[in-house]
Design a protein with these regions (language model features):
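Generic structural signal for secondary-structure transition and capping sites
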Residues: 44-47, 108, 134, 164, ...
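Acceptor/aglycone-binding surface of glycosyltransferases and processive sugar-polymer synthases
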Residues: 73, 84-88, 92-102, 116-199, ...
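Structured catalytic core of nucleotide-sugar glycosyltransferases
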Residues: 2-145
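Short conserved micro-motifs on helix faces and helix-strand junctions that flank
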Residues: 27, 86-88, 176, 249, ...
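Residues in soluble alpha-helical coiled-coils and helical-bundle/repeat scaffolds
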Residues: 29-33, 116, 120, 187, ...
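Hydrophobic helical membrane-anchoring modules
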Residues: 2-19, 195-337
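Regular, well-ordered alpha-helical segments
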Residues: 44-47, 127, 161, 310, ...
Length: 337
């Protein structure tokens, strides 16, 4: 059930949401071909929600095309459009963080800027929020992407669900609505390597999924290369699981056990059977195999140590070089990580 404060947002006469301010956070990187359609559709959706106090926060993540120019022109005719231009390409998650730091609404929706997250789904999120949910996330029931990529996503989410220390919803990305309370907790987290969909789950509060169909890109190509997808997967794994470290200990203990068993067999063959164990080649293979395992898990440990090192430097997650339609306040300054 919605709280009394939330019930004041409803207007029974026209179905619009009154006294409620929604922020929409959108990272943008080289999306000049998509932005005009996105601005039109998102603007219409926010207008349908009423009041006119909503805001669209676009974060230009170091685009080299006309994305920033298009946003600047649009902001002159629509005061709801807020633009942050980062000093360089800091990455998708950092750009979202910049928008979340800027958001002033009672709730915030995070969505991608390629129209794969459909703006028309936002009213459904708002309706669930008004029913009392702090987090409303999109659960993707269909994806219009190559089958191999869909398979990788499918396997990744299920592997993360098994390996993570917290419950991560299956097939849910960054497309979600979060209450002001959840937003403030997220903004207080200083992580440099951010996996926002995992952080959103870690915060807790009342959460619910909404089935949505993930659309195809309106135009252009995905800005998420294989390298960036793998980096995001590693951020999720190493930020929310210590299973790799535990696996190193388990495999190490297993290797020691196998070695001891082989030693006992060798002693038995030598002292009881009066046989000399053969197999120099097999011994070399075994040594090489376990040396490879050792080096692999040394790399895993190094990954954790490297991330700790990144956190200790406390560099900003992002740097804003320009702001449009937003005033500078202490709250707007980038968080140190």
């Amino acid at each position: 059930m919605a709280s009394s404060a939330e019930l004041t947002y409803r207007n029974e006469n026209d179905g619009m949401v009154q006294g409620f301010r929604l922020s929409v956070a959108i990272p943008v990187h080289n999306e000049e071909s998509v932005l005009p359609e996105l601005l039109r559709r998102l603007g219409n959706v926010l207008t349908s929600l009423g009041d006119g106090k909503h805001e669209m926060i676009f974060v230009d993540d170091g685009s080299i095309d006309r994305s920033l120019e298009i946003l600047e022109v649009a902001s002159k005719s629509d005061p709801r459009i807020v633009v942050l231009a980062l000093s360089r390409n800091f990455g998708h998650q950092a750009a979202i963080s910049a928008a979340l730091d800027q958001a002033k609404g009672d709730a915030v929706v995070v969505m991608d800027g390629d129209l794969q997250d459909l703006p028309e789904e936002i009213p459904r999120f708002v309706e669930k929020h008004l029913q009392g949910f702090d987090v409303v996330y999109a659960k993707r029931i269909r994806r219009k992407e190559p089958w191999l990529l869909r398979l990788c996503y499918y396997l990744f989410y299920r592997a993360m669900s098994k390996l993570s220390d917290i419950r991560l919803p299956l097939d849910s990305g960054d497309f979600a609505l979060m209450s002001r309370t959840v937003l403030e907790h997220l903004n207080s987290m200083p992580e440099h390597h951010r996996y926002l969909r995992g952080m959103r789950s870690w915060v807790g509060f009342s959460q619910v999924g909404v089935d949505v169909e993930r659309g195809a890109r309106h135009s252009g190509k995905s800005k998420y290369s294989l390298k960036r997808l793998l980096a995001l997967a590693f951020d999720g794994l190493f930020a929310f699981s210590i299973v790799p470290i535990r696996a190193a200990a388990i495999i190490g203990a297993s290797a020691i056990s196998i070695s001891l068993l082989y030693l006992l067999y060798a002693l038995y063959a030598k002292l009881i059977l009066r046989e000399s164990p053969q197999g120099f080649t097999a011994l070399v293979v075994v040594i090489t195999f376990f040396s490879g395992i050792l080096l692999f898990f040394l790399g895993v440990i190094g990954e954790y140590v490297g991330r700790i090192y990144e956190e200790t430097k406390r560099r900003p997650q992002y740097i804003v070089r320009r702001k449009i339609n937003c005033a500078e306040t202490n709250e707007d300054r980038p968080k140190m990580s």
